[in-house]
Each structure stands twice: as C-alpha cells, then as structure tokens.
Amino acid sequence: MTSTKDKTAITPTRENDYPEWYQQVVKASDLAENSPVRGSMVIKPWGYGIWENIQRQLDDRIKETGHENAYFPLFIPLSFLEKEAAHIEGFAKECAVVTHHRLEEKDGRLIPAGPLEEPLIVRPTSETIIGDSFSRWVESYRDLPLLINQWANVVRWEMRPRIFLRTTEFLWQEGHTAHATHEEALQETMTMLEVYRSFVEDVLAIPVIVGEKSPGERFPGAENTFTLEAMMQDRKALQSCTSHYLGQNFAKGSNIRFSNMEGQLEYAYTTSWGMTTRLIGSLIMCHGDDDGLRLPPRIAHKQIVIVPVIPKPELEAQVLEYAENLAAELRKQIFYGKPLTVHIDKRDKRGGEKNWEWVKKGVPLRLEVGPRDINEQAVMVARRDQSPKNKQSLPKQQFVQQAASILEDIQRNYYVQAATYRDQHIYRHLETFEEMRAFFTPKNEEKPEIHGGFVLAKWCGDPVTEEMLSDLKVTIRCLPVKQSGTKGRCILTGREATLDAIFAKSY
C-alpha cells in the first residue's frame, strides 16, 4: 500500500479505513450505487461494461467446453425446494417469497390480494427448477451428458449488504450438468474449475488458491465443493467461484433417471458451478490503489483513453483530427485476438479534471495530445500501473506499434503484484490454536479490518473442529488441491494430521 503522506485521489486511503476506501472507489470510479431497495444496487454503465466483458469472455470459454445457454424461470414453487431439505436449509433464511398475485386499492393504498395456492420462491439458485426440466429431457444414456449454462439474476436476502460483495440481488452464471457416471460428473466439476481458474488468473489477473471446501463450508446438498480463493488487500479471502459435484442427491430429488446401457433405470450424476458480479468487487480490492480502480487491460472495456489538449479554440479541429487519426491507427492493433478499444474524451472539461477521472476509473493507458504533439508527431503516455505523475512522450508510430505489448506488460504487472502480496501474507509457521487466536485477534480493535493474512496449517479433517473458529470469525477457506502429503499436528486439536488447510477471515 502507498504511503498515507502522498496526496491521493481517494479519501480515506486503504491503510486509514479499508471498508470506506472500498466504498469511495466504487463511487469515484462510477461503477455502481445503492438503489431505493435495501441491499440492491444500480450497476452503472462503467461497472456494467466490466460485467459485459466478463460475460463475453467467460461465455466463450463455457461454450468451448460443449455447454449451451438456456433460461429457466425466476419463480420456483415452494414444493420444489421442500424436496431438497438439506439444500434449502442453507438458503431458507435468505429466500424472498411471493405469496400474492395482484394488488388492490383500499382506502387509497395498494395492498396485496389474490393469495397464491402455493407460495413461489424468487430464485436463490436453480438446482431444483432446472432439475425438473432435466427429469423430462433425460430418458436414455444417449441423452447424456446434458451440459447447460444460464445467465440470470438471483435473489438472496442480505442483512449486511455491500455493493458487489453482498447484495440482495446479483447477476451470475450458473452451470448445471447431468452425467451417466460418477467419474464423468466429477471430471466435469474439475474441468469447469479449471475454466474458472484460467479466466480469473489470465483475464482478471487475480491469483487464486485452488482447493476443496471443508464439510462446514460445502454447498448444501453437495458431495464435494471446489473453490478459488483470492486474497484481498486487507488480507481477507474472497471466494471467486465454486464448482460442485452433487452426486445423485439432486437427481433423486428431481427424479432425473435414465436407462443405462444394460437397460436398467439409474439416477443421473449432476454438477453445478457459478460465478457472480462479486468478481467486480474482487477486481477493486485486489488491484485498486489509493487513486482508485486499476483495471487489467484484458477486462477493461476502454483500454486506451485519448484526452485532447486544446489551449485555444482555433486549434480544436486540428487537435481532434490528430486524436481521431491516432485512435483509428490504434484500433487496427490486435490485443488477444481483438482490436484495441479506444475512446476520445471530447467533453468540455479541463484536461486535468478529465485525466483524474480516468485515473479513478482505472483505464490502463491515458494519452494526451496537443499542438506540441502534433508538431513532433508524438503522444504523451501515462500508464495506470505507474504513478499518475509519470508521463512519457513517445513518437506516435512507435507507440502505435508498442501499444499492445505495453498493455500486456500492465496485465502481467497487476498479476505479479497481487501474487507477490498474497505470498508475502501466507503464514506457515503457526502450530497451535493459541497461536492462531493471537494471529487473528485484531491488534487495534478500532481498525480490525487489516489483519495478518492467510494461515496454511495442518488440519485433522474432523468437521466438528470447525466450530472452534467461529468466535475468531475465521473459516477454513479451502483444502488446497496441491497437498504437501507431509504429516504434522492439527492446528486446532493437536492431533496427528496430514491435510493442508487455508484458514482466513473472509467476505
């Protein structure tokens, strides 16, 4: 983190008040705002442009693995959820329930009327409603695998909302698949986990730990839940996505059966996996600095912004023509298979004001062009991965040819910076529960947000022991897929243990 002595665009800084810094970055970068409905947000064009890029690029990867998109109802009959007692237990307190189907006016006010015969649940997740369709679509092993994805909104009533991180309504994609064998379904679970990992690390430049959830953190009704865990700059964990192997549990509840190769009826093996708008919050907290958002070029929907510098009205046409020609040349350059996205800021504002707006919005490259640049056939270049004061004049043609490689360098820098920060704050030397308690106890009760980081330690695997962590507000984030295989002592009980586990506070 930068020194608080430096003048910054965002107040307070991360060090001074991390939660408020986050809220101010959301506001200053014009990503989103709160709505009249508590816990729901308005995603503004700058924020939604990021989500559209996430959608486009992730959707391509999902389809490359053989999945197709479909859409299922927002409303789920209560009876569908009652079939899955273990599943709904995890969502019951968060469900929004529709009980009436119309409004009537009474004494000048509108009141609900027309009670429904059966209450409807506003989609918290879609396993049950999609399972109902799967039960009709699957008859034979020849109908499998069934590989479906849905882009939709979800409602989970949130008592402590925070924009992008925890909202009552959020956007996501949810994949649902059915398979003939346990092996195929488990392979699907891991395949999609790898799709997520490569997307989050390669496109969003967020380093993650790939692992399996402990029983206490597992998706309700799943046999296995796999996750990607990222470290934010307050050293808390943020779950970036999950991929669930559901076994035959949901197939039995939804009666998804097929005739196998021997002609016998068998329940299908299913999976589900999802990623949400929470990723935008992860981008902010992983890459943002005390001047605002910093967008990795591969996810930025405006990779380059040109700010014309017009000292006199009579020079406006000449400067704008130079800017238009520069933009046209840049758009011919290819970055990861697509033309560079370039925007010319023609608003009637002072150059300095416009520059700082784009700094706060996180645009990877800012360019200034004015009369001097025209005379020298040059361009003034500022990179978002460097100090806003750092500007370099480059020959125009040289910059055009180097633009894509500069963006690639910025992309790489963001990943390396985040990975270095994470690795510096994973602690491997703690051995006892008392040491863990001391590690996670805030040194300053008035500012408890920024604590030590992640603890990598041995765990005995006993689900009961997870309850010991509740008063510390710590959870087992995951059991890393890459296990050391060494023996040691469980940090919670002192018993012999072989499992490596990541312990952390989280969002």
From Swiss-Prot:
Matches recorded under CDD domains: ProRS_core_arch_euk (cd00778)
Molecular function terms, GO-annotated: ATP binding; proline-tRNA ligase activity
Main location, first listed in the record: cytoplasm
Disulfide bonds: none
Subcellular location: Cytoplasm
Subunit structure: Homodimer.
Protein name: Proline--tRNA ligase
